[in-house]
């Protein structure tokens, strides 16, 4: 708007001189007031601290961008406050821009720092809020970063042909190396001015040295001039490999033997996966623990079981042995020696009485039970009968899992007692009270064993009943545990039945002397279609009932002992399971009373053995096998 004349009005009329003077005075007053106001504003701005204004704005930002706590003020209030503070700060900056340029520069730096902090707070707040609101599945995964161009992976030479396998022949080595060289023809080479990376620091590992040494010797023996190393390898690594291979060629024959052992181990590992076996004629078999299953069976396990139960000999090539053998071990040599001398104790007529242990006849090294399959070992009293000898599975069997300590073999550690084979019924429950040792339950029908609950404690046989004869034995004689291992029984009237092996073929005089005991014996006829083996030994069980006076020292009960005097521990154990029973009555007197069996005249009690406990006749009312079995079951119910 242009400057207006003081002598005229807005419409252009001429003013009175008095009005003109008053108008000019008012104009000057307004101008002075404006100047005054500007000075007051400048003074107020100079009184304010710009740094304090920055701090106030930072507090507002922290209040606004706090992801944990909601701001105390409203968003609109925060925005208005920040706007006013920002305008004030701008006026101060303009004021100092005109009056003091240095202060102006400092204020601009403060403003930049504030803006940086505000941006960081805003980013942090947004990231936290987004993380709270977004789902994990919606977050896009980052792409795989590309390899930096400074690393030239293409220029690194790939290794040459792999060393040939130790299972391949020398004729295949040349073919494999030529094929690998042809396959590596497309590998890019290094540029002209570049050197490939050298070998790692330090000497090569011993496996690499042995590998190159074996390759060098194999090539030299085969006369092949095939080049094993690719041209792209470093010359330094070549020279090192050559030096180490030369040092390997100068090594002694012991190193070659160790290399052969390692090759054998690798070959065995490969055989485990591929199922093929490569064996060199000059290589000895490695001394390592192997699990071998020999299956050359021409008859079924059921037929073998029936042959064993009937007393017939099962051919050795028809057995199925699963044993853990140690090649080149002394135990196997001792067992082989003992197996060649096994038939001699079978025909020995001078056997001890049933109560005499065979500790004097057996060296202590043979007391430990070797791992056998099939029935339980012969050292302890036999396990519960009526157990079909199925195919072996698992570790060598021992006594039942819950058997007391006196039922365990003397030399068998507890670690070897594994679970029984899968086809066998479970043994007696663990923790049963120590009672009489297991024996055959008389009166069971012939044929396969019933599939009922397993018998808790098999009853002892009545006097004079011989179990089936064992198959021919091969191996050292088996030792029964001494009498001191068995605790006193709970019932003084239980019969003890230690079996002993007596030859079946005797002289007429001996047979006439023992006519009375054998007349009341329960003997096992051979199965139909077979003939009895005249040389097969017969196992007799002799019943002894101890008097209360002789057993009072051991707890007031009769001592029960069942000692199987069986020779061979290597083959399967004789099962005291009768297939057929025939009761022979006395021809002279038909009273039906069973006479007490006594040892034959040719069996003498050894001097180191205590005299046997006095015999007592059996109760006269137990006449048949069913009555004997019922009485025994009642007795066992009272015990258990």
UniProtKB/Swiss-Prot annotation:
Entry-linked InterPro entries: WW_dom-bd_prot_11
GO CC entries: cytoplasm; nucleus
Domain of life: Eukaryota
Biased composition (Pro residues): 194-207, 372-412, 422-491
Residues spanned by motif PGR: 421-432
Residue spans of biased composition, Gly residues class: 547-558
Coiled-coil ranges (or none): 75-122
GO BP, one annotated term: RNA splicing
Major place of residence: cytoplasm
Localization per record: Cytoplasm; Nucleus
Biased composition (Polar residues): 1-11
Biased composition (Basic and acidic residues): 230-240, 252-274, 586-599
Annotated positions of the Phosphoserine modification: 285
A Pfam family hit: Wbp11
Basic residues biased stretches: 28-37
Region described as Disordered: spans on this chain: 1-37, 155-174, 187-563, 582-625
Keywords (A to Z) from UniProt: Coiled coil, Cytoplasm, mRNA processing, mRNA splicing, Nucleus, Phosphoprotein, rRNA processing
Comp. bias intervals (Acidic residues): 241-251, 315-338
Comp. bias intervals (Low complexity): 356-371, 603-616
Described function: Activates pre-mRNA splicing.
Record-given protein name: WW domain-binding protein 11
